């Protein structure tokens, strides 16, 4: 990646506030930990379906990647689908079959479904391996695709599900699942979690944590008032807070200031608002 001009100025080895999901930089709040524990329990106990809801920018994608890695480390067969807007149930089914290592697929939907079921049986029932599919941005799944997923989590032995499914989704999924036609799917959810916005204390802790990872243990340059300003403008959203912190570093570097005060954060936030316009800012967060 390109060297950022402010890294040396602030004594950083890496970019502290990148919005690219990275497990190393992911700060686990109590709420993230709870969602992680509940979801890991559903998967580990092979109970089937877990859902994690949250607004955009609350850390769903980071948590999805962290869970995926945790499952791989535990020896599970885990697959992560990050953009599930498939045109047909058949295309989603073929993707899932390939991702989970099904030896072959069939021309027909029914054929592929049977092959996947046999594969899941061999892995989960015979070999005793936990098989898990994690889907990020699951709010884009149409009802016909949700119906396919319901079929897949119906595959079971006498005491456990063959496939464990974890959905990470924006709140639209709640509305979709409220439809009477999806009552069957909804009733399969074993545990649901919701990621909320950060508190001011959590934002303080997140900035401190990320700066320590990027600097090798040093303290960040934001005053307490500057952190409060980031909190106010980001409204507790982790992604927006990281963007504001990053932009503030750049401006502080240009002004050759080693300490970052609230007025600098305010001007960065103002500049961001004016350049994005409110509508674009909302679109940008999508």
Regions found by a protein language model. Name each.
Residues 45-67:
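Walker A/P-loop nucleotide-binding motif
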Residues 81-85, 176-177, 190-203:
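Conserved AAA+ ATPase "SRH/arginine-finger" region at the nucleotide-binding site
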Residues 98-100, 171-172, 180, 198-217:
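Conserved AAA+ ATPase "sensor/coupling" helix adjacent to the nucleotide-binding pocket
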Residues 1-46, 282-286:
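A short, basic N-terminal segment
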Residues 12-17, 76, 87-106:
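Conserved NTP-binding/hydrolysis module of P-loop NTPases
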Residues 7, 88-92, 103-148, 156-161, ...:
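Mid-core helix/loop region of P-loop NTP-binding domains shared across ATPases and GTPases
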Residues 68-71, 173-188, 197:
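Short regulatory helix/loop adjacent to the ATP-binding pocket of P-loop NTPases
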